[in-house]
């Protein structure tokens, strides 16, 4: 789930690379954004249910979330969005807690990065189910993009 992103030299604040930030495993908020990389969205990224769902609805939900977010920002005079670090850390803990009840997180598979020598073993997809994920995203939006810093 990180390979395509690591093949691009993505740089955030102060020139820090995404690969450097995710050296110990990907950290995202809702699988859509990562702290330190303002205005950067990922579609079906780590921390989202993407690969464990029918990809078309996942992609559509992400595109709708992002486009609605951009519209909200324009309507409210914002030009920058970035997840708050605490929101990102809390989401990561939730993703791990949900994964820990499954055997998938213990298997040597690409889900944990076992297909890449030296890559940290981290279960990256959100396994809590697509409906539950959508509810969480909708709650974030309903609460004024809770967990995000807007400027």
Where on the chain are the PLM-derived regions?
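E1/E1-like adenylate-forming module used to activate ubiquitin-like modifiers
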Residues: 11-46
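Intrinsically disordered, low-complexity, compositionally biased regions/tails
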Residues: 7, 19, 148-151
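A generic structural signal for short, solvent-exposed coil/turn residues
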Residues: 2, 32-34, 102-104
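Flavin (primarily FAD) binding-site architecture
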Residues: 1-13
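Short clusters of hydrophobic/aromatic residues that line enzyme substrate/ligand-binding pockets
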Residues: 8-10, 18, 81, 110
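C-terminal, flexible cofactor-proximal segment of oxidoreductases
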Residues: 28, 41-151
């Amino acid at each position: 789930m990180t390979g395509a992103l690591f093949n691009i030299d993505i740089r955030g604040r102060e020139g820090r690379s995404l690969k450097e930030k995710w050296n110990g495993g990907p950290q995202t908020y809702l699988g859509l954004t990562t702290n330190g990389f303002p205005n950067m969205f990922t579609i079906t990224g780590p921390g989202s249910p993407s690969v464990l769902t029918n990809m078309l609805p996942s992609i559509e939900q992400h595109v709708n979330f992002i486009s609605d977010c951009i519209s909200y920002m324009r309507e409210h005079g914002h030009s920058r969005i970035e997840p708050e670090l605490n929101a990102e850390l809390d989401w990561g803990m939730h993703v791990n807690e949900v994964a820990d009840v499954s055997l998938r997180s213990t298997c040597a598979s690409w889900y944990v990065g076992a297909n890449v020598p030296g890559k940290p073993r981290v279960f990256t997809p959100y396994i809590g189910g697509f409906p539950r994920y959508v509810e969480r995203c909708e709650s974030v939006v309903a609460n004024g993009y809770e967990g995000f810093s807007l400027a």
